[in-house]
């Protein structure tokens, strides 16, 4: 669960950077 959370969080940050937006 913890690893999944980290992976999901990293993916969110990557998407944020890629799309040049961030909501969190």
Curated annotation (Swiss-Prot):
Binds to sodium channels (Nav) and inhibits the inactivation of the activated channels, thereby blocking neuronal transmission. Keywords: Ion channel impairing toxin, Neurotoxin, Secreted, Toxin, Voltage-gated sodium channel impairing toxin. Expressed by the venom gland. GO terms for cellular component: extracellular region. Transmembrane segments: none annotated. This is Neurotoxin 5. The keyword Nucleotidyltransferase does not apply. It holds the Pfam family Toxin_3. InterPro entries: LCN-type_CS_alpha_beta_dom, Scorpion_toxin-like_sf, Scorpion_toxinL/defensin. Residues 2-24 form the LCN-type CS-alpha/beta domain. It is found in: Secreted. It comes from the Eukaryota. GO terms for molecular function: sodium channel inhibitor activity; toxin activity. The keyword Membrane does not apply. Has the structural arrangement of an alpha-helix connected to antiparallel beta-sheets by disulfide bonds (CS-alpha/beta). Belongs to the long (4 C-C) scorpion toxin superfamily. Sodium channel inhibitor family. Alpha subfamily.
């Amino acid at each position: 669960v913890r690893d999944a959370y980290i992976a999901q969080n990293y993916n969110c940050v990557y998407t944020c950077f890629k799309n040049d937006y961030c909501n969190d």
